[in-house]
């Protein structure tokens, strides 16, 4: 019984939840970052980028490059986390629509669901958001 109590306490502990949020933010950010950096350093691939909505392939390519480079940096720092993931959610929703297969799979889906989870959960205690809120509430 003591073991069950310990496990339940550990899973409901705000410190543990914040640590899980930190690890999840870093996992998504580190998985996204290489794609953004690759797009920034290889602009010749912009011509192959699909035209989406009313944007030219170049505009779509560079906006995806900026989003996929800077959103992970914001996620790793936990800075403006919920605000930062909004453009990434839009970008990965568009990427999912463009790349969805007949079997309803897309390489963008795991990122999209991860970003939505981060938007819902927030940044947690181990983030710049927490410390900004702490500093602003004490003044």
Regions found by a protein language model. Give the residues of each.
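Extended, low-polarity transmembrane helix blocks
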Residues: 1-44, 48, 55-66, 70, ...
């Amino acid at each position: 019984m003591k073991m069950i109590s310990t496990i339940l306490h550990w899973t409901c502990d705000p410190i543990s939840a914040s640590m899980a949020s930190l690890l999840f933010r870093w996992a998504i950010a580190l998985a996204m970052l290489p794609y953004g950096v690759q797009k920034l350093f290889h602009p010749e691939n912009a011509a192959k980028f699909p035209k989406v909505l009313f944007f030219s392939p170049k505009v779509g390519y560079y906006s995806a490059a900026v989003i996929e480079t800077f959103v992970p940096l914001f996620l790793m720092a936990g800075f403006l986390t919920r605000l930062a993931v909004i453009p990434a959610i839009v970008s990965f929703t568009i990427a999912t629509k463009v790349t969805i297969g007949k079997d309803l799979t897309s390489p963008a889906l795991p990122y999209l669901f991860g970003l939505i989870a981060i938007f819902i959960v927030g940044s947690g205690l181990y983030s710049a958001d927490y410390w900004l809120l702490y500093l602003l509430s004490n003044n």
